[in-house]
Every structure is written in structure tokens, then in C-alpha cells.
């Protein structure tokens, strides 16, 4: 179904009311040919009037307004015709007065020209041109046509405009001019930031650490003064007598756990009231146990039990750590160690030989030193083999292979270990024999 003109008027009026593309809506309303009753039912005049103050949309709004007012004039007809007749009558009276003035001026000119030309003066009746006091005719301004619907909906539209003011239709403030001078607009501190930057440091505001002391805010009561003194000397609190708990509670809130226990031990009448303080301590340090129901125990006992359990757990953990650290240090201290041996082995043997030597507990003889060998080498030719045999260990000669094998086998059978000459020593002996 195509949209009717009435529906279009309502749709464009809603667009103007909500501020949705007002320029297009004003153009479409101007192009529509609809009776004024349709515009009146949709309250289009009020919506158009809002855009007359906008600099961009004032031209289109005035065109639509003139169109709406023109249609209403044609409807009213009779009442406005009477006003037009009165207005035309006033215009005619004014024109007649202007014509009389013009005739008088022409007559005066004609008289002057006649005297100059010395022509016979014509008889002119100047009585009708006698200047009298001009009657001032007050022309009343033409009253603007006021719509009946506008008067009815004035209150509702004004309230709606106040609640829903748009950015494109600013409200011009109506203020009466006053003779008093205007107050200076306070400037922000950021404008003077550059000026303060180039000033010396002495003029700048000093910065202090900590909280600002509250001095002179008000006169404190005697009770509050006493409480502040007690807060700074909690260790000196002893038996308080019949002082109510409400006065001591602000002081006890600042006390440590040991101080609170000492005060409660001295003043047993405060134990029941102070049990809630231990409940708060449990909820703060051990939140898992805060919602338990009391059954024959107090919150102080619960707190002491939990603290003891926590300390025991920490001590066990500390002992475990110390034992681990001690073990690690002892393991690190066992590194490479040097062993001092008094007597070196005569010959280099295999591991199996040393194991057998250990088992058989055979004593090893010391090898000859280099000095002894050098002396023996010098005296070989003189003293001969006898001296060399005295220096070298027993059996130092180089035996034959067959003989040595048979001797070894016999000795092994007897349970004795035969010492073999080292290859380097055998080589030295061969050289000495030569």
C-alpha cells in the first residue's frame, strides 16, 4: 500500500521531533499539498518552530511556517478581511493628506513663477491651504495569527522542550540588563602553569611527606582526649575498674594481641565483651574458621589454638629446611682428597696385583734413588757386578723366560708371590752389563 499524505506528514513530524535528518523533513513538508487540519493534528507547527533559531535550518523552517500560516489565513477568511479593510482605510486617509500637501506646494511654486514673469496674479483661495495641526494617526501593528491548538498545547510543548533540548536549537537566555558590573570569570590553574614553571623554587609550594596534621578543625571532647592518651600508653593500662567497655573499645582496637591478652587477664569482667574482637581477628587471619558455630568454646580459645597450630607447622617446616641445607653442605664438602704415601711401590703393576698384594700382606721394598743408580753406573767397571747386586733389590738380574716361568709356577704353588723386574729396570741392567 502506498503511503498517504497524512502518514507522510506524521512521519516527517516525528523526524523533526527526534532530530532525524531535519533538513530533508522540512523540504518534504514544504512540497506536500495537505490541508491545515492535517498539520494541526500532527502538531507540525510546534516542531517547525523549534528550528527557526537554528542558523542552518532557519530558512527551511520559515518557508514551512509561512506555508502553514497561509493556509490558516484562507480558512479564517472573514475575521481577517475586516482587519484588512480597516488597514486599507487608514492607508487611504494617509494618502489624502499627502495629496493636500502636494497641492499646496504646487500652488506656492506657481505664485513665485507668476511674480517673476510679471503676469497678472490669479485669484487663488488660500483658505483651504491653511496649515493646521496635523492629526497623528496611530497605526496599530497587525496581530499575528494565533492557533487554537497552539494555546492548548503550549504548556506540554514547553515542558517537553525543557526536558529534551537539542544541540541544533540552542535556547537563548532571556536575562534583564543589570547596572552592576559583571564578575570576572575565574581562570583555571592550568593557565598559570607555564608562569609557575619559570619562577624560583622558593616561591613554589613545598611538598611534605606523610599525612597532614589536623589542627584547628574542632574542639575535641574530654573523652576523646583521654582515649588518645591511652592509645599512646597501652602498655601502662592495668586494672580499669568499672569503666564501660564502649569507652575502652577504641583503645583496645589499637592494641596488639599480647597487650589485649594482658588487659583481659587483669580485667576478667571485659572478657565476654572482648570476645568479638577475637572473632574479628580470626576472620582476618583465618577466614576458613570464621563462620563456625560456638559450642562450649570462646573465640579467644579458637584463636590461640589456630595460632599454636600455625607456629608448629612453621617450626616443622624450618627444621626440614635446616636438615636439607646441612645435608647439601656436607655433600659438597666431600671433594677430591690428596693421600700421602710414605713408601712408593717398586714397580708399576696392575690392579689385580695390588689386590693380591693387599690380601697376602707382602711388604714392598723401596726403589733405588737416581743418585744411587748414577754412582753404580760410574763404579760398574771398577767394582763389577757384585756392587750392582748389592744396590739392586734381590733377584735383580734378568732371568730367562723359561726359568722365570718355572720359578713362578713353583712359587705360586707354594703360595708365595714372586717379584718381577720392571721393564725399565731390566733395560738399565742390560746397559750396565755391556
UniProtKB/Swiss-Prot annotation:
InterPro entries: Elongin-A_domain, RNA_pol_II_trans_fac_SIII_A. Residues 221-230 are annotated as: BC box. Residues 142-161, 391-415 are annotated as: Disordered. GO terms for biological process: transcription elongation by RNA polymerase II. Keywords: Nucleus, Transcription, Transcription regulation. The keyword Transcription applies. The keyword Amino-acid biosynthesis does not apply. Residues 151-160 have a biased composition (Polar residues). It comes from the Eukaryota. GO terms for cellular component: elongin complex; transcription elongation factor complex. It holds the Pfam family Elongin_A. Its main location: nucleus. It is found in: Nucleus. Residues 237-281 form the F-box domain. Heterotrimer of an A, B and C subunit. The BC-box, which mediates binding to the elongin BC complex, has the consensus [APST]-L-x(3)-C-x(3)-[AILV]. SIII, also known as elongin, is a general transcription elongation factor that increases the RNA polymerase II transcription elongation past template-encoded arresting sites. Subunit A is transcriptionally active and its transcription activity is strongly enhanced by binding to the dimeric complex of the SIII regulatory subunits B and C (elongin BC complex). This is Transcription elongation factor B polypeptide 3. It comes from Caenorhabditis elegans.
Amino acid at each position: 500500500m502506498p503511503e498517504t499524505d497524512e502518514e507522510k506528514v506524521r512521519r516527517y513530524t516525528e523526524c523533526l521531533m527526534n532530530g532525524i535528518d531535519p533538513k530533508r523533513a522540512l523540504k518534504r513538508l514544504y512540497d506536500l499539498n495537505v490541508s491545515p487540519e492535517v498539520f494541526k493534528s500532527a502538531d507540525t507547527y510546534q516542531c517547525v518552530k523549534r528550528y527557526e533559531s537554528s542558523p542552518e535550518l532557519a530558512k527551511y523552517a520559515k518557508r514551512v511556517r509561512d506555508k502553514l500560516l497561509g493556509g490558516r489565513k484562507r480558512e479564517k477568511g472573514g475575521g481577517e478581511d475586516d482587519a484588512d479593510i480597516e488597514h486599507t482605510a487608514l492607508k487611504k486617509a494617509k494618502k489624502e493628506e499627502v495629496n493636500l500637501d502636494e497641492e499646496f506646494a504646487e500652488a506656492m511654486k506657481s505664485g513665485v513663477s507668476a511674480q517673476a514673469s510679471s503676469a497678472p496674479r490669479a485669484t487663488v483661495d488660500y483658505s483651504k491651504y491653511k496649515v493646521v495641526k496635523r492629526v497623528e494617526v496611530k497605526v496599530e501593528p497587525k496581530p499575528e495569527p494565533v492557533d487554537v491548538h497552539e494555546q492548548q498545547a503550549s504548556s506540554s510543548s514547553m515542558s517537553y522542550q525543557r526536558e529534551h533540548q537539542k544541540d541544533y536549537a540552542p535556547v537563548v537566555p532571556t536575562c534583564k540588563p543589570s547596572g552592576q558590573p559583571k564578575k570576572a570569570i575565574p581562570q583555571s590553574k592550568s593557565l598559570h602553569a607555564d608562569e609557575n614553571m619559570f619562577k624560583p623554587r622558593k616561591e613554589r609550594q613545598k611538598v611534605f611527606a606523610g599525612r597532614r596534621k589536623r589542627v584547628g578543625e574542632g574542639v575535641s571532647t574530654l573523652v576523646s582526649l583521654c582515649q588518645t592518651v591511652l592509645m599512646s600508653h597501652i602498655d601502662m593500662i592495668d586494672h580499669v575498674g568499672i569503666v564501660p567497655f564502649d569507652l575502652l573499645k577504641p583503645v583496645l582496637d589499637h592494641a596488639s594481641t599480647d597487650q589485649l591478652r594482658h588487659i583481659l587477664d587483669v580485667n576478667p569482667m571485659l572478657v565476654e565483651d572482648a570476645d568479638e574482637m577475637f572473632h574479628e581477628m580470626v576472620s582476618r587471619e583465618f577466614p576458613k574458621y570464621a563462620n563456625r558455630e560456638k559450642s562450649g568454646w570462646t573465640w579467644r580459645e579458637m584463636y590461640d589454638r589456630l595460632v599454636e597450630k600455625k607456629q608448629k607447622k612453621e617450626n616443622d617446616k624450618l627444621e626440614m629446611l635446616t636438615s636439607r641445607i646441612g645435608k647439601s653442605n656436607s655433600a659438597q664438602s666431600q671433594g677430591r682428597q690428596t693421600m700421602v704415601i710414605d713408601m712408593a711401590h717398586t714397580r708399576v703393576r696392575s690392579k689385580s696385583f695390588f689386590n693380591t698384594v693387599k690380601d697376602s700382606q707382602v711388604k714392598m721394598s723401596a726403589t733405588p734413588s737416581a743418585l744411587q743408580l748414577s754412582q753404580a753406573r760410574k763404579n760398574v767397571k771398577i767394582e763389577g757386578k757384585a756392587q750392582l747386586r748389592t744396590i739392586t733389590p734381590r733377584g735383580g738380574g734378568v732371568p730367562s723366560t723359561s726359568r722365570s716361568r718355572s720359578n713362578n709356577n713353583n712359587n705360586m704353588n707354594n703360595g708365595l708371590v714372586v717379584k718381577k723386574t720392571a721393564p725399565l729396570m731390566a733395560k738399565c741392567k742390560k746397559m750396565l752389563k755391556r
